[in-house]
Amino acid sequence: MSHVRYAAPPAQGWDIHCHTVFSDGTETPGTLVEQARLLGLHGVAIADHDTTAGWREARAAARKAGLPLLLGTEITAVDDDVSVHMLAFRYDPANTRISDMFAGTRAARLRRTKRMVERLTEDYPITWDDVLDQVKEGERTTIGRPHIADALVAAGVYRTRSDAFADAVSAASKYYIPTPSPSTHEVIASVKDAGGVVVVAHAGDPRRNRRLLSDAQLNALIDDGLDGLEVWHRGNPPEQRERLLAIASRHDLLVTGGSDWHGKGKPNALGENLTDDDTVREIMRRGVDSGSRF
């Protein structure tokens, strides 16, 4: 039976792409859970960048609220110079292969962010300490460009984080430095080694790269064991949604949706794109009980 059940975003279900203060979101896991409950979502997932640091707090909040929770991570990757984000769910966080990969990516991201700030300080009134002031959970936070953007906002250079990302913090700016990242194939192998489920996030968003993942690149990931594609995301234009749905249907992939919520860090509204209950059940079935260690 095909896992492609909807040609349009489901009206009810789970938001399984959300960020908190443990990466580049502005709200705590507890606030995420409570807002999801108030919206009447069937469940929610925490998916901070390259970390599981917020899982324990999210699980405690979900138990208190009586809201189903999916534990996940948005993993930074690269595929032939295309920057790719991959959502991993229901994996063992104690798996050495995946935890070492996260540690390496976070360290590389920290070095890169410092180098970007060094470039920016030549033209803008910010320092590394100003950036650290925007980090809410210290060393447990995955630090990156959003924290630079927030420092620029605090300095009065820009009005919002989005404004900073449209200019000085943009991947097209002279200050930009890419983050050394594992390959998409390495990510899939690591997630599978940890017993998890892996989905390519916002694969059709043209604003994120000069070029998108090609059908051939996606087919290679499918051959490696890719589970699904995030189709329902505000960054995917209609023609890309149609393309991704066709690929998902052809290869019987899971089709997911998520808001990419960052609290006040982005205009994305919690619950604006959802994943249906049957798809979440299939993610649960395929993965391991990653919350049993918390």
Question: Locations of the language-model features?
Answer:
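C-terminal regulatory/interaction regions
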Residues: L245-A246, G263, P267-N273, M284-F294
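Extended substrate/RNA-proximal surfaces in nucleic-acid metabolism proteins
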Residues: S2-R5, A61-D215, N219, D278-M284, ...
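An N-terminally biased module of ancient metal coordination in phosphate/nucleic-acid-related enzymes
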Residues: M1-V82, V169-S170, P182-K266
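A short alpha/beta connector and helix-capping loop motif
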Residues: L32-A36, L270-E282
